[in-house]
Amino acid sequence: MMLSNISQTKAELLSGLGSSLTSSPGNVSAATMKLEAVMENLQRQHQQRMMEQHKNDDVISNDVRCDDFSDGGERQRSYSGSPKEDSDEDRNDMTSPMMRDDDDVMQSDGRSPEPDKTSLITQQMAFAAALAQRSSPDGSLSSLVPQAMMQHFGQFPASFDASQLPQGFRELAMLQHQHVAQRMAMEAQKRMQQDHNIQQSTNHIPTPSSASSHTSSGSVTSQTNSCNGSQQEWTYEEQFKQLYEIDDDIKRKEFLDDLFSFMQKRGTPVNRIPIMAKQVLDLYQLYRLVVEKGGLVEVINKKIWREITKGLNLPSSITSAAFTLRTQYMKYLYPFECEREKLSVPSELQAAIEGNRREGRRPSYSSHMFSYSPNTSANMLTPPKFPFAHHNGLAQLSQMAAAKYGQPDERCLPTSPTQQLIAQQQQLLQSANAQHVAAMAALETIQNQAKARQAAQQAAHHAAQQAAQHQMSLKKEIDSDYSEGEPPEKKLSFDDSVRRLTPDNQRRSSTSSLKISMGDRGRHNEMSDVTNADSINICVEVNGITYQGVLFAHSPNHPPVKHVTLDHPTS
């Protein structure tokens, strides 16, 4: 029912507009002037309403705009209504004599159109024309008005002319359209700015490789220097990206993922990639070359670092390339080699480094900077716990250590003051550690020598004690056999013989035969008169040889015996 009324109203509007255009020019001009006055009032009210809407920052949609036009049509109905039906309402709402004249003129036309529906549809047509003008490429209203009206308000004649719209309605629609267009343009610009900011932030966010899952600590900036001193800065993510994209080897990514995961689980995550010759050191290629040669210990013992350098395509002009490669390998790859390949153990590596040092090679600070544990591979290389004492001679110690042990040719020299201070402290620790190791080695040698001397002294003392005990036991046996009636001279001569058997006298007489001076009776025929009380049978063991003989006593009346020859020794 409502759709049929709207269609009928559209037809009446078109017929009314056509008849008004075909009528006399005077009536058309008078109606146009009065309609323009009404539209001026509507425009002022609309401007006030738009100011209120602008304060509230409400987004106006197409439906809201249609409702605004409907509200304007209702206000216009209050002006164009009959004085008999809405006389009280007209007196309260009309603000100028021109509004009352509008009612008289529209009543004098002799027609009785439906003013509410007519004004509503007229405003809708004006708004449709404004929409058509916005959509038109050349800004004209002639080509796209029928299509816009068909889209928004239903079927309209194809021959409809937009110039038939009153001037006031058209300006009102255009004013509202301009305001909405400005709001839409501002919102579109704001959205574009937001999209641009989001895109910039997305571009600045680094795209980490698969190894970034092992390092969630954020972006760590690593500033490095080349071997010639020229500075070159790469971020942590750029270094990882270069390391993963050196070549297209399929095993590279798998190896690097395993390496970083192992170091992370071990508690020593890789937070900096070493740089050599202005490029990232290829840890994968370095590991592969060293393992092919038999491991790090074999490379150190065979001194084939030059082949490793050629395999990495490093320039031969790099000084101390072997020292740098060995240091970096021990820091980043050797624990992984012990865990996966098991080509050597840390004790063998330490022995190889010490043997290389004895041959005159420069000492490696990293060989003593770590303590090794044979129980588990996870704690294979742990930082040392050396106390570092700060004193006034720190700079002098640093210079002496640098002059004696040399500076390691690092390709990743620090640039900031803090990093330089840390590097100096590390160098001082390295030199102090080397001196400490040398002092400990010398002390160990001295201790070993002292232990050897002490062991020899203990052995000699033990032998002397055994000899003394044996002599004492022999003396006790002799004393027990001849304790009764033994003359004092015999005891004295026996004490003298025992005194000769002391360790000092044994050493003196070890190379000569034993001769014992005794007294002699003078004549040989008188020997038969000697009784058993005048002689003693004696048995002496010297240096493992047993000597047996007879000792004769002498009296003051007889001359002393020149010498006594003992029996042949028995072993």
Curated annotation (Swiss-Prot):
Annotated Polar residues bias: 195-206
Compositionally biased intervals (Basic and acidic residues): 49-77, 487-507, 518-527
Keyword DNA-binding: yes
Key words, A-Z: DNA-binding, Nucleus, Transcription, Transcription regulation
SMART domains xref list: ARID (SM01014), BRIGHT (SM00501)
CDD domains, per the entry: ARID_ARID3
GO annotations of cellular component type: nucleus
Disordered: region residues: 45-117, 190-229, 459-528
Cell compartment(s), UniProt: Nucleus
Compositional bias annotation for Low complexity: 207-224, 459-471
Alphabetized Pfam families for the sequence: ARID
REKLES domain span: 473-558
PROSITE patterns: ARID, REKLES
Location, primary (coarse class): nucleus
Listed GO MF terms: DNA binding
Record GO biological process: regulation of transcription by RNA polymerase II
Top-level taxon of the source organism: Eukaryota
ARID domain: residues covered: 249-341
Function, as annotated: Transcription factor.
PANTHER family in the record: AT-RICH INTERACTIVE DOMAIN-CONTAINING PROTEIN ARID DOMAIN- CONTAINING PROTEIN DEAD RINGER PROTEIN B-CELL REGULATOR OF IGH TRANSCRIPTION BRIGHT, PROTEIN DEAD RINGER
Name of the molecule in the record: Protein dead ringer homolog
Organism: Ciona intestinalis (Transparent sea squirt)
Gene that encodes it: Ci-DRIL1/2
